[in-house]
C-alpha cells in the first residue's frame, strides 16, 4: 500500500491517533516511505512526491495530537535539514549492516561502514544537516543474523561508546541479553558489559546540554584506500566534549 492512496492514508492516521489515545504511545518509527536504499529525494514521479508529502502530513497530525511524540522517519528520508520541521530522526542510508575497509575485525569494519555513510551523505553532501538527528543502528551485539561475530570485549565497548558519543538523539541498542551476561571483561568478569552500557547512558545524560551541537571532526573513516582518524566534538560556551576514533589497525 502507498500513502498516496487516500483511503490508506486516512486509515494510517486513524491507527496512529488510536494508539496514542488507547496505549499512550510516545514513539513512532515510520519506515519504507520509499523503495530507495540510499535516497537523495523522493521516488521519481507524482506518486513518490505524494508519499513524501503524505508522511509529512501524518507527522503533523500525530504531533498535533501529542506534541512530545518522538518521530523516527527512516528509509525514504534523505539528508535535508528541512525534515526536522516534522521529524526527530532520519536514516543514515544504505544497508542495516555492512563492513567497509580492510582494517581490524568485522566489528571495527562495521563501525567504519556505519560512520563512513554519515560522512558521505551528511558531512560531505549536506553539511548544514545536523548529525545529532540520525538513526545509525548504533550498537549491535547478537549471535544471529548478518552482523559482527567478533565478541572481543574491548571492541564491543568501543562500538558502544561510539554509539553514544556521536551525539545522536536516537540511540538504538540491538543487544543480546545472554551475550551481555556471558562476555567477560579483561579481568575475567562476566556481565561487565551491563556496567559499561550504564556508564555510556549516564555519560550521555550528563552531556545532554552540549551533545545537541555535535559536529564531525577529522576525515573520512574509509576513503577507499586509507582509514582516517575521525570523531565528534560538541561545545556550548561552558563546556565541550571530544571523541576520536582510529579505524586503522595501526597507530596514527
Each PLM stretch: what is its role?
Residues 1-13, 34, 38-52, 145-150:
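The substrate-binding groove and active-site-proximal loops of carbohydrate-active enzymes
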Residues 1-23, 93-95, 100, 105-109, ...:
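Active-site-adjacent "subsite" loops/lids of carbohydrate-active enzymes
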Residues 12-43, 71:
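Short acidic catalytic loops
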Residues 14, 18, 50-61:
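Alpha-helical scaffolding segments of alpha/beta enzyme cores, especially the outer helices
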Residues 56-252:
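Active-site-proximal substrate-binding groove within the catalytic cores of carbohydrate-active enzymes
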Amino acid at each position: 500500500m502507498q500513502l498516496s492512496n487516500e483511503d490508506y492514508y486516512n486509515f494510517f492516521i486513524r491507527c496512529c491517533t488510536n494508539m496514542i489515545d488507547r496505549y499512550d504511545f510516545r514513539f513512532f518509527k515510520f519506515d519504507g516511505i520509499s523503495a530507495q536504499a540510499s535516497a537523495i529525494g523522493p521516488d521519481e514521479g507524482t506518486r513518490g512526491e505524494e508519499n513524501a508529502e503524505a508522511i509529512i502530513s501524518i507527522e503533523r497530525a500525530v504531533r498535533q495530537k501529542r506534541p512530545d511524540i518522538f518521530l523516527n522517519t527512516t528509509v525514504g528520508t534523505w539528508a535535508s535539514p528541512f525534515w526536522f520541521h516534522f521529524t526527530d530522526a532520519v536514516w543514515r542510508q544504505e544497508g542495516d549492516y555492512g563492513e567497509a575497509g580492510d582494517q581490524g575485525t568485522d566489528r571495527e569494519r562495521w563501525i567504519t561502514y556505519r560512520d563512513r555513510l554519515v560522512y558521505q551523505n551528511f558531512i560531505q553532501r549536506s553539511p548544514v544537516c545536523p548529525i545529532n538527528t540520525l538513526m545509525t543502528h548504533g550498537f549491535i551485539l547478537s549471535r544471529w543474523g548478518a552482523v559482527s561475530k567478533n565478541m572481543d570485549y574491548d571492541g564491543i565497548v568501543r562500538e558502544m561508546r561510539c554509539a553514544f558519543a556521536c551525539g545522536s538523539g536516537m540511540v538504538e541498542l540491538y543487544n543480546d541479553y545472554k551475550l551481555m551476561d556471558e562476555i567477560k571483561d579483561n579481568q575475567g568478569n562476566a556481565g561487565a558489559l551491563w556496567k559499561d552500557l550504564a556508564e555510556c547512558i549516564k555519560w550521555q545524560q550528563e552531556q545532554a546540554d552540549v551533545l545537541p551541537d555535535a559536529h564531525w571532526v577529522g576525515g573520512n573513516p574509509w576513503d577507499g584506500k586509507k582509514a582516517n582518524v575521525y570523531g565528534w566534538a560538541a561545545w556550548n560556551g561552558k563546556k565541550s566534549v571530544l571523541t576520536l576514533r582510529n579505524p586503522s589497525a595501526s597507530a596514527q
